[in-house]
Amino acid sequence: MPCESGGLECATIMAPIDYADPEAGATELALIRKQSSGRAVGSLFMNPGGPGGSGFDLIAQAVDFVANDTLQSNYDIVGWDPRGVGRSSPVTCLDSRQLDGYLYGVSSNPVGSDGWFDERAEAARGFADACARNTGALLGHID
């Protein structure tokens, strides 16, 4: 698969949505690799953690920062987006306009009041419901 960044290789693999029930379906994971500059003795998988960190972007944008010359000459450096992140079947909750309203909407109740807490709780339930509705079965299996 072509990569956005030169000198890198990109691919996707299929992984079970539920490892306990592989027949329940699969999801696509995006990978990126910088081949060793020498003779590789193996592959080194890197991910920034998070949750929500893109290992794909980490390698595409900062491989020289996270892997020094010694590592790059001895290992293929591989990054991936975990399920639900970036290029790997991302979790989808709200569109940009809705997300702005959720994050930056102004309450008619004073901050910290019972009414404000009730509004925030209702907004959080709406956000969670939108994630479930727009992401589907995968959401229950995000690691």
Residues covered by each model-derived region:
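Gly/Pro-rich cap/lid or specificity-loop segments adjacent to the active site
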Residues: 1-143
